[in-house]
């Protein structure tokens, strides 16, 4: 029921991946 939290988690994962690549 927390779609915002879900999206935030996805963004966090994406950011972590980008940081890893960088």
UniProtKB/Swiss-Prot annotation:
It is found in: Secreted. Keywords: Disulfide bond, Secreted, Toxin. The keyword Secreted applies. Contains 8 disulfide bonds. The keyword Transmembrane does not apply. Residues 1-15 have a biased composition (Basic and acidic residues). Residues 1-22 are annotated as: Disordered. One of its GO terms (cellular component) is extracellular region. One of its GO terms (molecular function) is toxin activity. It comes from the Eukaryota. Its main location: secreted. Expressed by the venom gland. This is Cysteine-rich venom protein collettin-a. It comes from Pseudechis colletti.
């Amino acid at each position: 029921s927390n779609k915002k939290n879900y999206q935030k988690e996805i963004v966090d994962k994406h950011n972590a991946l980008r940081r890893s690549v960088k």
